[in-house]
Amino acid sequence: MGDVIVLYASPGMGHIVSMVELGKFIVHRYGPHKFSITILYTCGSIVDTASIPVYIRRISHSHPFISFRQFPRVTNNITRNISVPAITFDFIRQNDPHVRSALQEISKSATVRAFIIDLFCTSALPIGKEFNIPTYYFCTSGAAILAAFLYLPKIDEQTKTTESFKDLRDTVFEFPGWKSPLKATHMVQLVLDRNDPAYSDMIYFCSHLPKSNGIIVNTFEELEPPSVLQAIAGGLCVPDGPTPPVYYVGPLIEEEKELSKDADAAEKEDCLSWLDKQPSRSVLFLCFGSMGSFPAAQLKEIANGLEASGQRFLWVVKKPPVEEKSKQVHGVDDFDLKGVLPEGFLERTADRGMVVKSWAPQVVVLKKESVGGFVTHCGWNSVLEAVVAGVPMIAWPLYAEQHMNRNVLVTDMEIAIGVEQRDEEGGFVSGEEVERRVRELMESEGGRVLRERCKKLGEMASAALGETGSSTRNLVNFVSSIT
């Protein structure tokens, strides 16, 4: 079997896709004669969806040198009042015996050159060491988030309080290399509640990042603030010990030709052909990720703001969540689109706007000549897709580490405009604020400057993955460390 690199993905489609993209980049650069890729993944998580096996079959067929090994089904230990992340982290730990047996079996017929794990799979770190396999983390966020995560155990140590971050409304925290402080209430969602087991899990994960052989990051050096790269390289983020080597190898995003196979053909063609008829850089694209969702009241405010702005738009609307306070939905259930929007909105904006239900081919849409702006939930994959396409953003974070990303996109990278969210109302944004930010991005001089900056970054993103680019060089350095 030769040399193999084993990747271990956290549960959930997004984590598996990120690992696949890393595997594809390695094989694309070195060829299957140098390395094959094996991706380990779990079975039975509460975040699993029906699309995962379909995706894996497709990748197995189109990329034969990437193989998948699914673990036996494990039952979630679901307890009342325990959060989904805490249940998921416990589920991952229950899979440790399967990790051990997989590495043992693979090692019998091949040389495992590296074991690359997701941050949430930290319990597998000592298992890699058991087999004397160099073990690396794959960070699917940017360098600024990595800097924050490396420093988080220090903040935990220094925060002499029993209060949770979600309750520290007047407190801000500084991270090495960041230009502006972060509100305590905008910390990564996993650590907002000190009483949630996910809090101590996350601190544990972050404290183990420096104990790996290195960290691979899905970003490229030219995108990141120099102060952040210097803070990581200079050891400021891990003040009590050495920082392992860090390899920036992005932007790794899913290819258009693969995405298109999963699309609903008719609706996809409708929105793409509509975009082809619009003037250059005139359309605002609104899409909030695979799970981002709003209650009906917020959808109506967005609609009012779009209508008042007078701008062209393509808006992906998902079914409102069952719980009013939730900002996530799983799956793409059907719903009455007209029923969640203001009466007559679709008719009044039909000459300049298009609303699609649940899904649009985001990578393809962002690359259309007519798209001039992107309202995003600030998920890192979406950010990279916009950067590659050279499209400026309006940052509207919803959950996970997205508020942290917003800070960096607006203040440090200067590639987005932030919306003003009412924290006391669950992040509610008024229609007037939507109109204001849409006009600022699409009509103002500041928006034009942002667009020019993003266009240049798009060119840099392409260059980073080129033969002499920074990300290719960093991948070569990583491979040198394992061979």
Curated annotation (Swiss-Prot):
pH-activity dependence text: Optimum pH is 7.7.
Keywords: Glycosyltransferase, Transferase
Active site, renumbered: H15, D118
Top EC group: transferase
Catalytic activity: phloretin + UDP-alpha-D-glucose = phlorizin + UDP + H(+)
Enzyme Commission designation: 2.4.1.357
Residues annotated to bind an anthocyanidin: H15, A400
Tissues where this protein is expressed: Highly expressed in roots and at lower levels in leaves, flowers and fruits.
GO molecular function, one term: UDP-glucosyltransferase activity
PROSITE patterns: UDPGT
Binding site for UDP-alpha-D-glucose: T140, A360, Q362, H377, W380, N381, S382, E385, E401, Q402
Superkingdom assignment: Eukaryota
Reported temperature dependence: Optimum temperature is 25 degrees Celsius.
One Pfam family recorded for the sequence: UDPGT
SUPFAM superfamilies, per the entry: UDP-Glycosyltransferase/glycogen phosphorylase
Function: Glycosyltransferase that possesses phloretin 2'-O-glycosyltransferase activity. Converts phloretin to phlorizin (phloretin 2'-O-glucoside), a potent antioxidant. Is specific for phloretin and does not possess glycosyltransferase activity toward caffeic acid, catechin, chlorogenic acid, 2-coumaric acid, 3-coumaric acid, 4-coumaric acid, cyanidin, 3,4-dihydroxyhydrocinnamic acid, epicatechin, 3-hydroxybenzoic acid, naringenin, 3,4-dihydroxybenzoic acid, quercetin and rutin. Can glycosylate phloretin in the presence of UDP-glucose, UDP-xylose and UDP-galactose.
Family recorded in the similarity comment: Belongs to the UDP-glycosyltransferase family.
Name of this chain's protein: Phloretin 2'-O-glucosyltransferase
Organism: Malus domestica (Apple)
